Amino acid sequence: MGSPKALLEFRGETFLDRLTRVFSQFCSPIVVVVGAQADDIRSGVKRPERAIFAENANYQLGQLSSMQCGLRTMPEKIEGVLFTLVDHPNVQASTIAALLEQPRPLLAIPRYQGRRGHPIYFGAGLIGEFLSIPPDSQAKAVIARHLDETRWVDVDDPGILDDVDDAAAYRRLIETA
């Protein structure tokens, strides 16, 4: 695609600027984990004050290692975590609001037309579990252990499914904007 996903443009903003703007309406701090091309991403963000950047030196181990890096950067006393991937830039603010409705469950996962997506919410009680599994494994292992404690949040937001993994997916995203 020619540049880091975080710096791809969507509706006049980079993916990362859009996500930090939307998420900052609901939570603080916003922790952004960078790995490959970290300097390019930091310098390409238009509103860096909205985020705390954490650099994952082990990003090549996969997404869980980046999640763990971000969790280690969080303040000690938090209620929970909203977690998303930078290649899901089209999530609506209303979806985040729905995930954060009280009382908050251990896990909240959005669904659109029966398909689950991002972001997810998890309570602080799960942070230790995510940190305890090998960084080259998958977060799904922790989520699977707690499906009976999960609130499934049905939303009218196809953006939770938008996963921009290649140039074709990016074109589809831009065409729907």
Cite the ranges covered by each PLM segment.
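Short glycine- and hydrophobic/aromatic-rich loop-to-beta-strand nucleating segment
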Residues: 118-122, 162-164
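Conserved alpha/beta core of the MobA/IspD/sugar-nucleotide pyrophosphorylase nucleotidyltransferase superfamily
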Residues: 134-177
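A conserved catalytic-core signature of glycosyltransferases
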Residues: 116-117, 138
